[in-house]
């Protein structure tokens, strides 16, 4: 394993117009302050205020959106980062680990990774993801790309269909089909930051949001050594060259993760588990008293001095005393949150330090809060109660099904652009309106300029004479549609679907 020196990981250079020369501690901190400004002021962050956390299209402002959730994750991430640095300082390891002049950037990278961790999520969350992937699977049949004979291939797109005697081209077609059928919020976040928004963040800051290290076009089993890290797609074929460069800049082995990403992940796990339960009480899905009984029953074994007693029972008893003249709900969640943080944050920090050689190396194949401890059990308790009593609630399920239908319907509406021939679509891109394609012209006009420019730039880098040109052009055209629809807020997607389906 490599010697632990965070100066080799906290890389303050950028992909474009990077600062040159040796920098002082203050100058490096200013570079990361610039990252903070770029992130906080980006439209992608603002759009989170109208994207779902648990309850789609929620009008109650007290219920969390992706933005308020991300701000809470940011605060917990900062807390964990400070706890880690404080413990390393006590152990007199800051200088040995190259962190004595990088504590500010360390905290900032964690905070901004937390704030950005959901920016790639489509409308209606996981149901939006499922709708996109199901829609493309029904047309591209990625599983058929492995079939023999090739005549069994049911792919509906000529440019992506496998052909005899074209093995190198077929390999590209397989990759493209697999990639397009594995839309994922984390991978879309990388695409947003680099390709669509062109934020030109430091290498270290982008490393912080590369949560999963599996390429979206991956086929077959993942290696056991990286099974957790490769649990989901982390980036698309379109960003593969950028990720390759990122790995070099951050000294990451293939399929390995940037060290500070584990902190962001732990902060997210801690935040959403309590928040989902609080939102459910706000929505009157159950009362605080009912929630306490759900938690009590699900914990199972009750022993004096257990973590459940210290965290949940303590919050329940204090909320019933009503010593602060606040509602029982407010008091219960205040104490539950404080108790949970006070137990889980130090534990996550210690897990980070105890496993630092593997974490620094990028190969620690677990989450910080995923082990056999009672701390991990407490998080699982919150998650299981939410799954059983919140996510399965009829109101929540109905909204999720509506969200799935909205995203599927929007893809159906924009399908004429994907049915156009390469020559016809190229003409439409150049002229923006083509008289013999009235529907397609109007649909194309609705696409955002940012997404259209990303398509044009990607295709302009291809050689029209190359045999793979039709395949890759179609790939970027599909990305254009996925980018546009996944970038919508819940409310915009809902309204757009109703308008275009003429139901208003």
Curated annotation (Swiss-Prot):
Its cofactor is Mg(2+). Its EC number is 3.1.5.1. The keyword Ribosomal protein does not apply. It catalyses: dGTP + H2O = 2'-deoxyguanosine + triphosphate + H(+). NCBIfam families: dGTP_triPase, PRK04926.1. InterPro entries: dGTP_triP_hydro_central_sf, dGTPase, dGTPase-like, dNTPase_1, HD/PDEase_dom, HD_domain, PHydrolase_assoc_dom. This is Deoxyguanosinetriphosphate triphosphohydrolase. Residues 66-273 form the HD domain. Keywords: Hydrolase, Magnesium. The gene is dgt.
């Amino acid at each position: 394993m490599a010697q632990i020196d965070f100066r080799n990981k906290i890389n303050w250079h950028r992909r474009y117009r990077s600062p040159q020369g040796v920098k002082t501690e203050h100058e490096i901190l200013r570079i990361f302050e610039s990252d903070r400004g770029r992130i906080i002021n980006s439209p992608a962050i603002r759009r989170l205020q109208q994207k779902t956390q648990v309850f789609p299209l929620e009008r109650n402002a007290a219920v969390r959106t992706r933005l308020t959730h991300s701000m809470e994750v940011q605060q917990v991430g900062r807390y964990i980062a400070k706890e880690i640095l404080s413990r390393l300082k006590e152990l007199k390891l800051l200088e040995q680990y190259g962190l004595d002049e990088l504590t500010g950037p360390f905290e900032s990278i964690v905070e901004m990774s937390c704030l950005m961790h959901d920016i790639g999520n489509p409308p209606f969350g996981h149901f939006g993801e499922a709708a996109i992937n199901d829609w493309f699977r029904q047309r591209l049949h990625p599983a058929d790309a492995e079939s023999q004979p090739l005549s069994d291939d049911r792919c509906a797109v000529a440019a992506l269909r496998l052909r005899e005697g074209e093995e190198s081209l077929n390999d590209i077609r397989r990759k493209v089909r697999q990639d397009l059928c594995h839309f994922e919020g984390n991978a879309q976040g990388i695409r947003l930051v680099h390709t669509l928004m062109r934020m030109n963040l430091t290498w270290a800051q982008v490393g912080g949001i590369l949560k999963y290290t599996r390429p979206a076009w991956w086929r077959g089993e993942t290696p056991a050594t990286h099974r957790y890290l490769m649990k989901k797609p982390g980036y698309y074929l379109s960003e593969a060259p950028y990720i390759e460069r990122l790995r070099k800049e951050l000294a990451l082995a293939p399929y390995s993760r940037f060290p500070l990403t584990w902190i962001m992940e732990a902060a997210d796990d801690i935040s959403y588990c309590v928040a989902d339960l609080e939102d459910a009480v706000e929505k009157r899905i159950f009362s605080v008293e009912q929630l306490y009984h759900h938690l009590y029953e699900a914990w199972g074994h009750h022993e004096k001095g257990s973590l459940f007693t210290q965290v949940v029972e303590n919050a329940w008893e204090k909320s019933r005393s009503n010593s602060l003249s606040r509602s029982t709900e407010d008091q219960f969640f205040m104490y539950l949150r404080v108790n949970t943080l006070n137990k889980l944050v130090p534990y996550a920090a210690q897990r980070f330090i105890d496993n630092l050689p593997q974490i620094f190396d990028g190969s620690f194949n677990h989450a910080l809060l995923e082990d056999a401890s009672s701390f991990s059990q407490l998080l699982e308790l919150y998650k299981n109660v939410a799954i059983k009593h919140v996510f399965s609630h009829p109101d929540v399920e109905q909204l999720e099904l509506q969200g799935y239908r909205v995203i599927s319907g929007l893809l159906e509406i924009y399908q004429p652009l994907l049915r156009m021939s390469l020559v016809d679509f190229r003409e439409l891109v150049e002229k923006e309106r083509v008289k013999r394609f009235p529907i397609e012209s109007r649909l194309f006009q609705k696409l955002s300029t940012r997404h259209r420019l990303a398509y044009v730039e990607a295709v302009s880098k291809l050689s029209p004479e190359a045999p793979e040109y039709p395949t890759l052009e179609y790939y970027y055209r599909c990305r254009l549609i996925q980018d546009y629809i996944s970038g919508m807020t819940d409310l915009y997607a809902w309204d757009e679907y109703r308008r275009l389906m003429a139901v208003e």
